[in-house]
Amino acid sequence: MEFSMNATVEQLAPVEQQATAGWVVAALYQFKEVQDPADLQQRLLDLVKTINLCGTLIVAGEGINGTVAGDREAIDTIHQFLLNEGFNAMEYKESHSSDKPFRKMKIKLKKEIVTLGVEVKPRDLVGHYLDPKEWNELIARDDVILIDTRNDYEYKAGTFKGAIDPKTETFREFPEYVKKELEQHKDKKIAMFCTGGIRCEKSTSLLLQEGFKEVYHLKGGILKYLEETPPDESLWEGECFVFDGRTAVTHGVEEGANIKCHACGWPLTPEESALPSYEHGVSCLYCIDKTTEKQKAGFRMRQSQIAAAKRKRL
């Protein structure tokens, strides 16, 4: 079977309901040369058809990236498969979810495992890695520029104290932000962070490639920081947006209180979801004035169809 570089293969997770133990969620990535990405995609697809797994894995010539969820056996199976494929230096983190965090299992074939749109060499040139303790010491300094490399809606859910929001909607916009806003700071200490670490592999590589002198990033990203840092020692404020059914997590990588507006994708605090502007799957205070009544009617129809499908599965 042949796949184009933009092919997406979807496989419905074979088990709709999970055991009472809940779902193990594994976030992983590694930059590593993959000689035949399409072949790896197909073999992954063959594997996930046989186990109880949901989520997304992205395969490219530069490596693998993704988040998957399943029972303990399924997670161990996919983890061992990737180790056997030579991904033995993965940035790998586990957490848990009481509910199924993804609807489907997707194996995507792309040009990049995280899309920056600018050629960089994260296997050869990256910033200085810092563990949580070192990170706290660095970002407490006055001579450090702290940048959140994530998107605007992620920043909204929570960030590190004093972090700059580049106001990007996608990671592709980050190189333009660097060009416009950071060029004059090449001699400054730059500290960057993201959810799991992968975007900073590329963003720090980009800055070093552009001539920045001192570039640092949080090893393992926010998720590792929240896993290892006690709340009373933490410089994190709010919750960390995640791309699954949990919406956001907090210290200990426990599910947070934010929910997602399924009309616009923005995270909402309990106070925001209690406002009259919020209608599940239809609107929130951030998008209610950005859609027409016809669009809202379509969203309501979609929600009715989703609810009917759920009732049918019960």
From Swiss-Prot:
Give me the reactions it catalyses.
Answer: uridine(34) in tRNA + AH2 + O2 = 5-hydroxyuridine(34) in tRNA + A + H2O
What InterPro entries does UniProt report for this protein, alphabetically? Answer: Rhodanese-like_dom, Rhodanese-like_dom_sf, TrhO, TRHO_N
Task: State if Oxidoreductase is listed as a keyword.
Answer: yes
Q: Which GO terms describe its biological process?
A: tRNA modification
Q: Which Gene3D superfamilies match?
A: 3.30.70.100, Rhodanese-like domain (3.40.250.10)
- Name the domain of life this protein comes from: Bacteria
Which residues does the entry assign to the active site, renumbered to this chain?
A: C194
A Pfam short name? Rhodanese
- Give residue ranges for domain Rhodanese: 140-234
- Family affiliation: Belongs to the TrhO family.
What this chain does, per the entry, is described as: Catalyzes oxygen-dependent 5-hydroxyuridine (ho5U) modification at position 34 in tRNAs.
What is the protein name stated in its UniProt record?
Answer: tRNA uridine(34) hydroxylase
What organism is this sequence from?
A: Acinetobacter baumannii (strain AYE)
